[in-house]
Amino acid sequence: MIAARAANLQVAMKALALAVLALAYAAATARAEQCGRQAGGARCPNRLCCSRWGWCGLTDDYCKGGCQSQCRVSRDGGDDDVAAVLLTAPGGGRAGVASVVTSDQFERMLPHRDDAACPARGFYAYRAFVAAAGAFPAFAATGDADTRKREVAAFLAQTSHATSGGPYSWGYCYKEVKGATSDFCVPNARWPCAPGKAYHARGPMQIAYNYNYGAAGEAIGADLLGNPELVATDPTVAFKTALWLWMTARSPSQPSPHAVVTGQWTPTPADSAAGRAPGYGLTTNILTGGLQCAGGNGGADRVAFYKRYCDVLGVGYGPNLDCFGQAPFDGDIMSASAAK
């Protein structure tokens, strides 16, 4: 089964060759530094460290070597340390994603990610997830409690499908495609490929192509054009790339998955005519460019992961779970799991 999933991921890479993503809109909205003297003295949310370059994070690159504020925490603590120290709300208790999904619930959702059969074993840690989420303060912090739970369930469901070794508790089994036959480098003046580097699918959302690595790296403060391997070696960076794809609208007419699941998107008459409606199903449409909206097992798998995770979090599923019959926005593909 795992070999078959690997083959499916390779097929997904070929499907991505048909898409050219419109990144100008995303890059224009994600360029500014986040903290410190570069941002008027602002502090990072959730008590993350502010690096010398003005970016928020948890690793030693952020917390040491010129760190500007909130520098006492490094990534060496355990999961409980991250929740208690980094994600403490001003009035006590937990804040951010740690207030929505606990480490125990994370383990229940992804019990096999560290199985010996999974190439990503030991990589996708809860502490890396909550640290990465701290760089996106609106994630799991928009709307009421049920909305926040559904967003976490939706994000983990889509990324579980992208990295799955089987249904529906084998999410996060893979961290990159093995044996890629292409370097996924295409001509791009703004995001040129670095010599000898490959931009195949990596991380929870299986980010691929130099233009995605470049834009994501700029947004999170990492040189992913020069060091794309970071997405498969640094779990916090890996989660940040997935969250960037989740939080970023690809064009003014196409919402981010975050905007959809948190109720911030309202369909236009053109959207309604195209069958596009609020709900988890629309995130599949956005992430796959509509490739899984004509039926097939891929869309059904995504729904099954989502339902299971909603059950773990104790929240209802909401409407419109699949995208069957929905027209794509513009054919762009955000996730390399589009053909799975």
UniProtKB/Swiss-Prot annotation:
Residues 1-32 form the signal peptide. It catalyses: Random endo-hydrolysis of N-acetyl-beta-D-glucosaminide (1->4)-beta-linkages in chitin and chitodextrins. Its EC number is 3.2.1.14. GO terms for molecular function: chitin binding; chitinase activity; endochitinase activity. InterPro entries: Chitin-bd_1 (IPR001002), Chitin-binding_1_CS (IPR018371), Endochitinase-like_sf (IPR036861), Glyco_hydro_19 (IPR016283), Glyco_hydro_19_cat (IPR000726), Lysozyme-like_dom_sf (IPR023346). Expressed in pistils, stamens and lodicules. The keyword Coiled coil does not apply. Keywords: Carbohydrate metabolism, Chitin degradation, Chitin-binding, Disulfide bond, Glycosidase, Hydrolase, Plant defense, Polysaccharide degradation, Signal. It comes from the Eukaryota. Hydrolyzes chitin and may play a role in defense against fungal pathogens containing chitin. This is Chitinase 7. It comes from Oryza sativa subsp. japonica. The gene is Cht7.
